[in-house]
């Protein structure tokens, strides 16, 4: 749940990879977090899932936990999508709906001042203890060093909701740690369990086509197959590369997504945590040099990137 009232999120500091994507045509977003080894007792707040998240679940495997899901009477609803395209074929475990027999794992809490509907907390340690399968991993390739070339930058700003700063995400590079510290709406993005600021070795802006099913502004259609532009940030460096996933919208969905550098070679992720910001091809993204991202940014120190140009391997 990335609504401003859902902050601070619980357990996000334990996630190995997080995606943020638009779920409303007005720019409201939601996040999908992947936990691959550290399973906190409390994670969330948990909200309803959207169809594009199912495609990512098929790519990674494992349990997909949510609290309600995208409905509708046509094929662009989550139940129909899972029955037609998922390896599971039914919207049941490991699709884990908190409005179900597993509701005990999704208690509501007022921790951190959260109120409904932004107060559903998931016990990930209980889910992990119950899950007996070992999903086939689809990892990135990794390097200890990360990028040593590219444009020197201090950070990046993505404002999904242009009418307000309620969904503004920013990253500021910390040379002492070699990580990009995350901010939401001008404040440090912290883990509600620990109070620590979340920081990432890899920040990727994934550009793709985004539309709305049957013109409904609450039902996103996000292309996560084929290829597109990727703006990649590591070690205080920025390059414009690409992404590719060899699958159709309904077939071979377990194929992994690969990121390439500006020369079309697969780009290893730097060892550490990764955040992927999914944006529309025409979404402006501000790349910042020299000035502090969390403070005022002089116009001459920033520039906006945009565009749909695609790179091929």
Functional labels for PLM-detected ranges:
Residues 1-19, 24-312:
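A surface/extracellular/periplasmic glyco- and lipid-processing/surface-interacting theme
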């Amino acid at each position: 749940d990335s609504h401003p009232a859902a902050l601070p999120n619980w357990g996000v500091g334990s996630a190995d990879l997080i995606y943020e994507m638009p779920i409303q045509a007005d720019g409201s977003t939601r996040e999908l977090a992947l936990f691959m080894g550290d399973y906190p007792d409390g994670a969330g707040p948990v909200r309803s899932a959207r169809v594009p998240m199912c495609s990512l679940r098929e790519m990674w495997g494992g349990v997909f936990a949510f609290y309600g899901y995208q409905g509708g009477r046509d094929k662009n609803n989550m139940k129909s999508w899972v029955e037609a395209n998922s390896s599971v074929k039914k919207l049941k475990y490991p699709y884990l709906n908190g409005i179900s027999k597993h509701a005990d794992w999704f208690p509501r809490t007022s921790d951190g001042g959260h109120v409904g509907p932004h107060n559903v907390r998931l016990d990930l340690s209980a889910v992990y203890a119950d899950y007996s399968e070992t999903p086939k991993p689809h990892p990135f390739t990794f390097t200890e060093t990360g990028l040593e070339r590219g444009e020197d930058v201090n950070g990046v700003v993505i404002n999904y909701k242009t009418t307000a700063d309620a969904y503004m995400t920013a990253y500021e590079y910390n040379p002492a740690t070699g990580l990009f510290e995350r901010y939401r709406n001008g404040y440090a993005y912290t883990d509600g369990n620990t109070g620590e600021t979340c920081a990432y070795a890899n920040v990727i802006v994934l550009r793709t086509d985004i539309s709305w099913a049957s013109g409904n502004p609450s039902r996103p259609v996000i292309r996560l197959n084929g290829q597109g532009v990727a703006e990649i940030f590591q070690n205080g460096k920025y390059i414009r590369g690409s992404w590719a996933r060899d699958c159709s919208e309904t077939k071979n969905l377990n194929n992994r997504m690969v990121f390439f550098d500006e020369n079309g070679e697969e780009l290893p992720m730097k060892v550490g945590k990764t955040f992927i910001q999914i944006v529309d091809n025409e979404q402006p993204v501000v790349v910042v040099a020299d000035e502090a991202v969390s403070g005022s940014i002089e116009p001459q120190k920033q520039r906006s990137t945009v565009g749909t140009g695609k790179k091929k391997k």
